[in-house]
């Protein structure tokens, strides 16, 4: 009789869970609006190993938060988020990359998904667990990220470019490991695909584009120039010299710049910053 959202987390022996009757009953519950939290695999109470294990508490909480804790003001909005670094190979052993961990982009993807958006997370190599309630698209290089973004361009309402994409890659990739020699070594570099420039040049009026900038000086001036040059609607500016901001930390200090004004945010968690970004998108 309850009218509130209802979640079910089945936990049982693998044979019971995989029984067709159980599976039919779970489908019936979903048909009537129940959210079924997938069981995990592992050691069960009966000492068997298999599916049917109750998910960890943090996983259950994630599902509960997704169901009841946030307004679904982004429901139906198709959002693509890029996150993390790219890797540009030099040889089979080495590559050029940067210090990005992907934490900011992942936080944005999670915030948007929690508010009902249809989120695609396009990301480079990270040590982070997948973001639930999103479509996961792993890539490695700038070229792969370019292809992932452009191939989904027409099916996107909001594009949030939080990835730290390499500007240059080795002009040639050695087939074998480059051996150490006496003296210096020079590496010829070439430009990678400028994803934001392509997006700005092909941007339809309906598409909302948010970029990120990392600066060490003239934060507002340089970021505003990038906003205009790349034809973006919003840019999130980071000053890497501010304590608690930038790569590898769980906090950030950002300035959100749009054509309507500038909003400076104090030091806070990256989840908090992501919430402000989601607010800006919901209110656009």
Segments from the language model and where they lie:
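Short, acidic/small-residue loops that bind anionic groups at enzyme active sites
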Residues: 1-13, 28, 182-198
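Short, glycine-/small-residue-rich phosphate/pyrophosphate-handling segment
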Residues: 3-43, 50-64, 205-234
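Glycine/threonine-rich flexible loop motifs
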Residues: 16-19, 90-97, 168-180, 185-190, ...
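Glycine-rich phosphate/diphosphate-binding loop of Rossmann-like nucleotide-binding domains
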Residues: 23, 27-28, 73-141
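Glycine-rich phosphate/pyrophosphate-binding loop and the adjoining helix
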Residues: 41-77, 97, 241-284
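Short glycine-rich anion-binding loops that position phosphate/pyrophosphate groups of nucleotides
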Residues: 42, 84-88, 126, 163-170, ...
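Gly/Ser/Thr-rich active-site loops/lids in small-molecule metabolic enzymes
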Residues: 97-115, 178-197, 231-237, 267, ...
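A glycine- and small/hydrophobic-rich beta-loop-beta segment
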Residues: 124-125, 133-197, 201
């Amino acid at each position: 009789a309850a009218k509130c959202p209802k979640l079910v987390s089945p936990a049982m022996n693998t044979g019971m869970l995989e029984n067709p009757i159980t599976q039919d009953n779970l489908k019936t519950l979903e048909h009537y609006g129940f959210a079924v939290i997938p069981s995990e695999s592992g050691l069960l109470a009966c000492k068997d190993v298999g599916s049917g294990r109750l998910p960890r508490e943090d996983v259950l909480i994630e599902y509960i938060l997704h169901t009841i804790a946030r307004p679904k003001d982004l429901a139906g909005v198709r959002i693509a988020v890029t996150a993390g670094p790219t890797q540009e190979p030099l040889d089979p052993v080495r590559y050029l990359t940067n210090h990005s961990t992907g934490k900011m982009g992942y936080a944005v993807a999670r915030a948007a998904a929690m508010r009902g958006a249809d989120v695609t997370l396009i990301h480079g190599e990270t040590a982070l667990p997948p973001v639930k309630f999103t479509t996961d698209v792993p890539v490695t290089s700038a070229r792969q990220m370019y292809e992932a973004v452009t191939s989904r361009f027409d099916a996107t309402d909001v594009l949030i470019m939080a990835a730290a994409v390499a500007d240059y890659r080795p002009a040639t990739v050695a087939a074998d490991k480059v051996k150490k020699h006496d003296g210096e070594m020079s590496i010829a570099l070439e430009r990678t695909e400028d994803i934001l420039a392509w997006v700005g040049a092909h941007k339809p009026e309906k598409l909302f584009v948010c970029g990120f900038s990392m600066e060490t000086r003239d934060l507002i001036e340089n970021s505003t120039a990038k906003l205009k040059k790349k034809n973006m609607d919003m840019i999130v500016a980071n000053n890497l010299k501010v304590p608690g901001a930038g790569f590898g930390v769980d906090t950030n200090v950002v300035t959100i710049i749009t054509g309507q004004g500038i909003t400076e945010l104090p030091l806070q968690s990256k989840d908090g910053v992501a919430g402000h970004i989601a607010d800006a998108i919901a209110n656009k």
